[in-house]
Curated annotation (Swiss-Prot):
Protein name (record): Threonine--tRNA ligase
Domain notes: The N-terminal domain is an archaea-specific tRNA-editing domain that hydrolyzes incorrectly charged L-seryl-tRNA(Thr). Catalysis of tRNA editing is performed by the charged tRNA itself.
Region (Editing domain): 1-137
Similarity comment: family membership: Belongs to the class-II aminoacyl-tRNA synthetase family.
Keywords from the UniProt entry: Aminoacyl-tRNA synthetase, ATP-binding, Cytoplasm, Ligase, Metal-binding, Nucleotide-binding, Protein biosynthesis, RNA-binding, tRNA-binding, Zinc
Native organism: Methanococcus aeolicus (strain ATCC BAA-1280 / DSM 17508 / OCM 812 / Nankai-3)
Length: 630
């Protein structure tokens, strides 16, 4: 069942003409005000268990209506939501039953007739939750009041002081969470435990959304689907550098880069089972007689590749890596937020085949530290949450406490632990790391997951003599999506500005690392020679030759977050020195300047960027020739 839920000022329809499958009805027109309009398409797969589809659809409608605090519901058959429709007989029965169930629960219901050509008018309220789409399956959901749901143990959350080992493990509840001193862990715990955040409202635009356009990094592409971006030269450079950074890190850790398709056939049983575990937030479509999907991660291609490999124990741990350009998730339109939540994104994705539990936890630990290093390198400190099933935790808790202790020793931070009574997902353990945004909310980035299910599903085997075994597979994204990395960097820059520091990106990621500004025309020749020499030495520099005052040029360099701004006048030309404002050492109120030779400046920038990837600047050397994208 596909449904589209619209919070409406009103819905008005008129049945115009019967089709061959039209139901007989006296209700040929109708209008309802202040309502939830539910457009529905009953699908072929719903015929397997129509009762569960009815139950789940009614449950979804009621949840939405309660959130919106409305009691009027319009049930509107709308075949255009799906290309795989059920038989007319089943569709009529399902829609009628949904109407009856809602009425029994004291909702006022208007149902448009099935099988008629209808005209309709609708007015959508236009708030973030006013347009929602859902894919309803035949899998039965349970009511809150059902015994099974009541008896099922809930996940438990703990805070762990790694220095104290098991004695440092304290269970969390809402009261204790709100008293946590570590703002990052408090934010993560509140988010995971469903505790209402007391900060700024969700619909306020986060600072990074302004930055991405203001700094000519990227912007929404209006001619594409919502949540897809176009990247300008500066943004493309930043993204490419981040991709190079992850590539180098993975290869240094023995990962083997591969490339796989973005599109997969849902007729493959393993592909469909894996895709179905991620719910309805997918791009699916029909081409000829094939049902296809766009990938939401690189799992599909890598697993199919591993299935065809002849893997021996000596090959393990075996790591395949792909930068999935692109991955796709059909997030709800009202949930799309800049680079934090979007529909098309770039995901570094590594999958490691492990021999046994010992090798699995060794690799998990190695990849945990690798992920943490990305936070160090990007200067975006992470808050960390571990999640384990209770069985896995009990079997491996000594190892976990050892890792938590080492983490505390290095970073001085506690961790959150979530214990899950029974395995619900493909993994038995994972670690997630988050950057905290300007509103105090987590941006989930790196992750490592212990997958005990996919090897069997995709028939990935390790050949050991005459035996074939299904290995454990680690999923790892060392940084999280490239877009979210940039989101975290920009949100941190906003927090830095709030604290009085000039916002900036790390020097190795700054599109323009140095800008040379002449005071007057007489200084231009020397200033230009400096800019050229910087470029010749692998520094992304430009030369501000625009017809503007020196003050405005300096302000523009500040707006562009240029880390090193060199102003050249008489003194600089005569003494062969560069008066350089160093952004990282400055405050918003007081710039810090140093007198450097060209060689000293080059050495300084080289030292700042040592060990990080480099790409040249594609923009012209002369600022006057650089095109304006925004």
């Amino acid at each position: 069942m596909k449904v589209l839920l619209i919070h409406s000022d009103y819905l008005e329809f008129e049945a115009k003409q019967k089709t061959k499958i039209a139901e007989d009805t006296d209700i040929l027109n109708g209008k309802m005000e202040e309502c939830l309009t539910v457009f529905m398409a009953v699908e072929k797969e719903d015929e397997e268990n129509p009762q569960n589809v009815i139950y789940n659809t009614v449950d979804e409608i009621i949840k939405t209506a309660e959130n919106l605090k409305i009691n009027n519901v319009v049930v509107y058959p709308y075949a255009h939501l799906s290309s795989e429709l059920s038989s007319p007989k089943v569709a009529k029965e399902v829609l009628q039953k949904i109407e009856e169930e809602l009425k029994q629960k004291n909702y006022s219901v208007l149902r448009a007739p099935f099988g008629w050509y209808k005209s309709f008018k609708i007015s959508c309220k236009g708030h973030p939750l006013s347009e929602l789409s859902r894919k309803i399956t035949t899998e039965r959901k349970e009511e809150k009041g059902e015994t099974e749901a009541k008896d099922r143990p809930k996940n438990k959350f703990y805070i762990l002081d790694g220095e104290k080992g098991e004695e440092g493990l304290k269970e969390l509840d809402e009261k204790k969470v709100k008293k946590l001193k570590d703002k990052g862990l408090k934010s993560v715990a509140m988010h995971e435990m469903g505790i209402k955040h007391g900060g700024k409202e969700k619909d306020i635009e986060p600072p990074h959304v302004k930055f991405i356009t203001e700094k000519e990094i990227c912007d929404y592409e209006p001619s594409s689907d919502a949540g897809h971006f176009r990247w300008y030269p500066k943004g493309k450079l930043i993204r490419d550098l981040l991709q190079d950074y992850v590539y180098n890190m993975v290869v240094e850790n023995n990962g083997m880069p591969v490339e796989t398709p973005v599109m997969y056939d849902l007729g493959n049983k393993a592909i469909k089972e894996h895709a179905d575990k991620f719910g309805e937030r997918q791009y699916r479509f029909k081409q000829g007689n094939k049902d296809l999907m766009l990938r939401f991660a690189a799992c599909f291609g890598q697993f199919m590749m591993k299935k065809d490999m002849y893997i021996l124990p000596k090959h393990l741990p075996l790591k395949l890596y792909e930068l999935s350009t692109y991955s796709f998730r059909y997030e709800q339109r009202g949930e799309l937020v800049g680079l934090k939540r979007l529909r098309g994104f770039t995901m570094p994705d590594m999958h490691t085949v492990c021999k046994d539990t010992k090798q699995t936890i060794e690799e998990f630990e190695n990849q945990f530290w690798m992920c943490l290093k990305t936070g160090d390198d990007l200067n975006t400190p992470y808050s960390t949450i571990f999640r384990f099933t209770e069985d896995f935790f009990e079997e491996n808790k000594e190892w976990f406490f050892k890792v938590a202790k080492e983490y505390k020793e290095k970073y001085g931070k506690d961790v959150i632990l979530e214990l899950i009574p029974e395995r619900k997902h493909y993994w038995v353990g994972k670690v997630d790391m988050a950057v905290i945004d300007s509103f105090g909310r987590p941006i989930e980035n790196p992750t490592v997951q212990i997958d005990v299910e996919s090897a069997k599903r995709f028939n990935i085997v390790v050949h050991d003599g005459n035996e074939k075994t299904y290995p454990v597979i680690l999923h790892c994204s060392p940084t999280g999506s490239i877009e979210r990395v940039l989101c975290g960097l920009l949100e941190k820059a906003s927090l830095d500005a709030d604290a009085g520091a000039p916002p900036m990106l790390p020097v190795w990621l700054s599109p323009i690392q140095a800008r040379v500004i002449p005071v007057a025309d007489a200084h231009s020749e020397y200033a230009l020679s400096v800019a050229k020499k910087l470029r010749e030495n692998g520094i992304r520099a430009d030369f501000d030759d625009r017809e503007e005052s020196v003050g405005k040029k300096i302000r523009n360099a500040g707006k562009d977050w240029v880390p090193f701004v060199i102003v050249i006048g008489d003194k600089e030309v005569e003494n062969n020195i560069l008066t350089t404002t160093i952004r990282e050492k400055s405050t918003l109120k007081k710039p810090v300047k140093e007198n450097l030779t060209v060689e000293e400046l080059i050495e300084k920038i080289k030292e700042e960027t040592k060990g990080f990837p480099y790409r040249p600047l594609s923009l012209p050397l002369y600022c006057s020739l650089q095109p304006i994208f925004r």
